[in-house]
Amino acid sequence: MSSTLGVMLKELNPALSVQLFEVTEKPAQEASNGWNNAGTGHAGICELSYTPNQEEDGTVDVSKAISVFEDFEHSLQFWAHTARRGIIKDTRKCLNSLPHISLVHTQEQVPYLKARYEGLKKHHFFEPMRFSTDRKEIADWAPLLMKGRNEAQPVAATHMDGGTDVNFGEISRSFCQWIDEQENCRTQFGHRVVDLNKKTSGKGWIVTVRNEKTCQKQKIHADFVFVGAGGGSLPLLQKSGIPEVSGYGGFPIGGQWMISRNPKVVAKHTAKVYGQALGAAPTMAVPHLDTRMIDGKQSLLFGPFAAWTGKFLHNGGSHFDLPLSVRPGNILSLMRVGMHNLDLVKYLVEQGLQSKESRMRELRNFYPDARADDWEVIDAGIRVQAIKQDPGEEPGIVHYGTEVLTSADKTISALLGASPGASVSTQVMLECIQRCLPQFLESDEAKERMS
């Protein structure tokens, strides 16, 4: 998100000074890292979490899926622009076209998927989508889904070509490198922002940055600050003291994947296949079986498996992140998370204690013939879900999705939340510019660039 905003602002106003600080020693080591996310270009095609409910009349509200599709198209257009400009050097390293498939395998889920398909087909975005309960046709789409499956088990799937596998880490690295090469711009790794203080006169901020190797601190004067620190955004916002952050808390959710690098297995699956979340599973734990292309190598990924953690960042975080984020303004919300989300807390604990064989049983819902020897468990990234109190709601509701929090004077903005996240980074950052820095969109040159 931060590198996307940096590129957009520098493209709109080449004279602008941009500085980017990152606590890790290299770019894209947290949520953007290829193995810390599923790499799904979230377009609402296969992700059933955007259309979770079937109404009493049998229909499914597909408006969220349509909105996500449109936002992802904006990202594709921006990435195409940056490729033409030479900012992204090789799109094959970060963007690969793959079919997106939704799979259900219970009697209750089949009518839901059919209704979802019928709702989506009415919109031109999803005209190419196909629905099937024919086992042979589904096997043609993704052979591993059907091999060894009980013939008596109900099954249905939707299929659509033109989905995307995205290496967000590669895009982030390309953007950071380009920013660092521009005049009046700099990216500094191994530097942690430790404090944010509002200027005593005029608008803007004094940003205190610490070199993690030397412990030397420097102060940067900035007219505008964007906090795109993933799970670390909330503690930084709290340091800023802006009233808008009062009442917000963070609920970290760790994750793990099962991956297969066996060429014989990997070669039989070329798609991203999403199912439905089970029980109290959070949105980020919707199970999926995915082809991944990272560093030119193809592999197969299944998960995610969630876990309890106190850390807000995978590499740059501490197990004290959660307790240190407690403030008088959010303690009630945090305390009530447990009261309102007992099933979720229980789910996270159970997931963290799962054996490999237990995980294999979940995998076999997608790939019935899966062999344990072909799979290994690796750590995934950490998502920090926003906790807040909305008008009319009880405190302590876990909010899923991507949200931008902005100060009243528009001098600081931050990204909170997770999915669809990086997939809609272009739209989210454009809205941030429109809200906080509209002057950069007013010139004829800027309007032409954005058209």
Give the ranges of each region predicted by the language model.
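Dinucleotide-binding Rossmann-like beta1-alpha1 core, especially the glycine-rich loop
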Residues: 39-140, 299, 311, 317-321
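Conserved beta-strand-loop-beta-strand element in the redox core of flavoprotein oxidoreductases
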Residues: 194-220
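Flavin (primarily FAD) binding-site architecture
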Residues: 227-243
